[in-house]
Amino acid sequence: RECEDGYYSVVAMLTAMPIDMMVQLDDIGIDFTTIDEYDLFLLLVGTLKEQDTSLVFADLDLKRFQAAVNEQNGNIVLVDESSGVVIDRAIHAQIAGALRKIHHLEKDNRKPANGEAKEYMIERARKKMRRQRNRENASQLEELIVALVNTEQYHYGFEGTRELSIYQFNESVRQIIKKIDYDNKMHGIYAGTVSAKDLSQDDWNWLTHK
């Protein structure tokens, strides 16, 4: 369970958009609308170095990376001098993009319309954080695995599921949701409660999902 929590914490930090951490940024005096996701990543690197990132980066140790300035464009980058590996804005975007694809995460690019809306968003997010702090979090993966193993469309047992990668497991979840939704719509058509003409091309094809 600790390993799972640690993994998802690292994924959350690597894929975070400023709006995702507007409360934390506000607490240290940073307006979340004035920075981008790479700026946020650079702010979070110190915290990431304290985490076990091996499940994401394997043997690439973030502790060895130090901030440096790219002399060609003046941008701040992270450099591991022992290996010569550089993490810049483009590399971070690739890492975050890959993790979002694996976990089906959407980039949240929302910006408040004005200062009043921004304060309202921050206050709502702050209240939500307080509620979550008082709630004991169940294992996200465990709940999904138990649900799927007891679903007829899922053809793996508990042991078989352990052999799947995170990406394969998440794809299975989405595919099964799509198949169940398709079956329900087809039953609705035959029962006369769903109109076939109201269905889109995507609704008719359960083999793909977006």
What are these regions (language model features)?
Residues 1-35, 93-188:
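An amphipathic, hydrophobic-aromatic interaction surface with interspersed Lys/Arg
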Residues 1-89, 101:
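Short N-terminal mixed-charge amphipathic segments
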Residues 9, 54, 82-83, 139, ...:
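Generic serine detector
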Residues 60, 87-90, 136-139, 156, ...:
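Short coil/turn linker and secondary-structure boundary residues
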Residues 189-210:
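Long, intrinsically disordered, low-complexity Ser/Thr/Pro-rich regulatory/activation regions
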